[in-house]
Amino acid sequence: MVRTINETFLKACRGERTDYVPAWYMRQAGRSQPEYRKIKEKYSLFEITHNPELCAYVTKLPVDQYNVDAAILYKDIMSPLPAIGVDVEIKSGIGPVIDNPIRSLQDVEKLGEINPEDDVPYILDTIRLLTTEMLDVPLIGFSGAPFTLASYMIEGGPSRNYHNTKAFMYAEPKAWFALMDKLADMVITYLKAQINAGAKAVQIFDSWVGTVNVADYRVFIKPAMERIFAEVRPMGVPMIMHGVGAAHLVNEWHDLPLDVVGLDWRLPIEEARARGVHKAVQGNMDPSFLLAPWSVIEEHVKGILDQGMKEPGYIFNLGHGVFPEVNPDTLKRLTTFIHEYSKGQLAK
């Protein structure tokens, strides 16, 4: 069964003009929703993602509640790592913890390959369920980027400074590039499988790449990213790049064969465009504003929209994920305001 979907988000990704600015929010499915918190009382994140019906429900919930223009599959960037031999546990209040961190070329060589239909069939089944029976907006698939995945695999968990990761990168370049190649292979296969299952766009999250300077990015990270985007591009769906604290890297991303450059709040949209970023742009509200009074939110969002709408190809989003403390009613009101305000401005 082929469902008719609202393609406003996809049009914006392709740099086309739209009647209004499409919006979705990173971590829109999850921590701020009472319904989700009740589910989490009974099930862990990995238990939810292993249950296609439950995972599809969680993924669709913000579409119904907030009227956003895209759904993003509920899962974690660590979800594919067990398939290649990495033991991951999501610990409450900490995040992903890995008991067998990478320390040598031999550790890298032990990593296997992912076969999505065998290793993560529940993720693909969730995508099929959502796209054939449930959603009337596009579904975004996603993956972590090699650098961010490598940082968890080397540090053994979250880090404030990523000293071990960068030390490994500098001191063991042969092992580093072997790891980047292994992870790039995994990301390519994983994203292609999500697209084949029905994802209409994909986003790559490089959450911690902002810790790397431009010169090191070009040498140690960009080659893997170029290969990922080049090999996934023939699949014909929009591809989005997003990182946090990475304003100094947006021109490097713009050079990649992708469609949408994601921005966080540290770099104004108009400044990114002044630097030469003229692909579609996604962003870039500081999620902290969602805890402010509505009058403050409205004025701030107007400013972001006014910048974003100056060129076709703009998607409203946050610069990072929704906080648990955010009132779901605020997100619903925000989506309505984005749609109505942008529609009025674009009609002028």
Curated annotation (Swiss-Prot):
Pathway entry: Porphyrin-containing compound metabolism; protoporphyrin-IX biosynthesis; coproporphyrinogen-III from 5-aminolevulinate: step 4/4
Binding sites annotated in the UniProt record for substrate: R27, Q28, A29, G30, R31, F46, D76, Y152, S207, H320
SUPFAM superfamilies: UROD/MetE-like (SSF51726)
Purpose: Catalyzes the decarboxylation of four acetate groups of uroporphyrinogen-III to yield coproporphyrinogen-III.
One family name in Pfam for this protein: URO-D
This protein's encoding gene: hemE
Annotated keywords: Cytoplasm, Decarboxylase, Lyase, Porphyrin biosynthesis
E.C. number: 4.1.1.37
CDD domains referenced in this protein's UniProt entry, alphabetically: URO-D
Upper lineage: Bacteria, Bacillati, Bacillota, Bacilli, Bacillales
Name the UniProt record assigns to this protein: Uroporphyrinogen decarboxylase
InterPro entries linked to this entry: UROD/MetE-like_sf (IPR038071), Uroporphyrinogen_deCO2ase_HemE (IPR006361), Uroporphyrinogen_deCOase (IPR000257)
PANTHER family: METHYLTETRAHYDROFOLATE:HOMOCYSTEINE METHYLTRANSFERASE RELATED (PTHR21091), UROPORPHYRINOGEN DECARBOXYLASE (PTHR21091:SF169)
GO molecular function, one term: uroporphyrinogen decarboxylase activity
PROSITE patterns, per database record: UROD_1 (PS00906), UROD_2 (PS00907)
Family, as annotated: Belongs to the uroporphyrinogen decarboxylase family.
Cell compartment(s), UniProt: Cytoplasm
Any one annotated GO CC term: cytosol
